[in-house]
Curated annotation (Swiss-Prot):
Keywords: Cytoplasm, Hydrolase, Nucleotide metabolism. The active site is at D67. PANTHER family: BIFUNCTIONAL DTTP/UTP PYROPHOSPHATASE/METHYLTRANSFERASE PROTEIN-RELATED, BIFUNCTIONAL DTTP_UTP PYROPHOSPHATASE_METHYLTRANSFERASE PROTEIN-RELATED. This is dTTP/UTP pyrophosphatase.
Length: 185
């Protein structure tokens, strides 16, 4: 049995590309209780907490947990609370390069645990006020770290990426695939 510690439709869609049969169960953790560390350490601690929270309920299962955040100039950009916060985020990212970090935590059915942080650099085009307003009118910023999804209207903001495209969507499937298949270390 394979468990994805998420109800994210994007993560489910991506995981189906490498694991056709799995169950999705959200992790119940208090993210605010975890100390905010540097971005890579923080996403790894969130992924670890999510995965570990499901171990008691699924002791013999392979559990996959992930957490993705956007960071700009060392500051974490989570999911915007409202349109105004989304506007601030998108405006700040215009013409700049930021990082997308995903912490992966995998507990195999044999009990071994693997962890990794994947980083992707994303550069936005310079954005006018009209560009930002046009993007926000699509409501595509909702429920997205950094207020954009590269798989939808957010793609029009992106000038280039350096790294794993699927990491920006929330699940770096190439890395995850290798974590699932690798020999125990």
């Amino acid at each position: 049995m394979i468990i994805l510690a998420s109800h994210s439709p994007r993560r489910q869609e991506l995981l189906k590309r490498i694991v056709p049969d799995f169950e999705s169960h959200p992790a119940s953790i208090n993210e605010r209780a975890l100390p905010v560390l540097d971005p890579p350490a923080y996403v790894q601690s969130l992924a670890t907490a999510k995965g570990q929270s499901l171990v008691p309920s699924y002791p013999g299962a392979t559990i996959i947990a992930a957490d993705t955040m956007v960071a700009f100039q060392g500051k974490l950009l989570g999911k915007p609370h409202d349109r105004a916060e989304a506007k601030q985020m998108i405006t700040a990212l215009g013409g700049q390069t930021h990082q997308v970090y995903t912490g992966l935590w995998v507990r195999l059915d044999n009990g071994s645990v693997r962890q990794q942080v994947v980083t992707t650099d994303v550069t936005f085009w310079p954005l006018s006020e009209a560009d930002v307003e046009s993007y926000l009118a699509e409501d595509a910023y909702q429920d997205k770290a950094g207020a954009y999804g590269i798989q939808d209207a957010g793609a029009l903001l992106v000038k280039s990426i350096h790294g794993d495209f699927y990491n920006v969507m929330g699940l770096p499937i190439s890395t995850l695939y290798r974590m699932l298949l690798a020999e125990p270390q």
